[in-house]
C-alpha cells in the first residue's frame, strides 16, 4: 500500500487504462454511410449451421468492413449505398457491424409485424 506522499509524487501512474473501441470504423459516430462492393453468404461458427447474408462495405472514411444484413430477404447489390451501425453477430467472426434496414438503398423487411423498427418496415394498414 503506497503512502500519501508516494501517491502525490506519482499522480499519473494511477490513471484508469484507456478502453479500446469495439467499433473503430464508426469513429465515435452512431452510424456511417458506405458503398457495398461485395454481397455474399458466410457459414457460422461451430454448433450453428446456416448461410448468413453479409456485405463488404467501403465506408465514407475509406475503411472497409464486413456487415451483416439482418432479416429475411434483401435487395442489396454491388454499388448499393447503405448505412451501417454497430452490433456484432456472435457466430460470425470478424462481423462487428449491421446494415440499417429501410435506409438509403436497402429496403425494409416485407410483411414484418413485430420489431418493425429494427427492420425498417412501415406500419401495415
From Swiss-Prot:
CDD domains: Ribosomal_S12 (cd03368). GO terms for molecular function: structural constituent of ribosome. Its main location: mitochondrion. It comes from the Eukaryota. Keywords: Mitochondrion, Ribonucleoprotein, Ribosomal protein. Residues 1-26 are annotated as: Disordered. GO terms for biological process: translation. Residues 8-23 have a biased composition (Basic residues). Belongs to the universal ribosomal protein uS12 family. HAMAP family: Ribosomal_uS12_B. This is Small ribosomal subunit protein uS12m. It comes from Prototheca wickerhamii.
Amino acid at each position: 500500500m503506497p503512502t500519501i506522499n508516494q501517491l502525490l509524487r506519482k499522480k499519473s501512474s494511477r490513471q484508469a487504462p484507456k478502453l479500446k473501441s469495439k467499433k473503430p470504423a464508426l469513429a465515435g459516430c452512431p452510424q456511417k454511410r458506405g458503398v457495398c462492393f461485395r454481397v455474399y453468404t458466410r457459414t457460422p461458427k461451430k454448433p450453428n449451421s446456416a448461410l448468413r447474408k453479409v456485405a463488404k462495405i467501403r465506408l465514407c472514411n475509406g475503411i472497409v468492413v464486413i456487415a451483416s444484413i439482418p432479416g429475411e430477404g434483401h435487395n442489396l447489390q454491388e454499388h448499393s449505398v447503405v448505412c451501417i451501425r454497430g452490433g456484432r453477430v456472435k457466430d460470425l467472426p470478424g462481423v462487428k457491424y449491421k446494415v440499417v434496414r429501410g435506409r438509403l438503398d436497402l429496403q425494409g423487411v416485407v410483411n414484418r409485424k413485430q420489431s418493425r423498427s429494427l427492420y425498417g418496415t412501415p406500419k401495415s394498414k
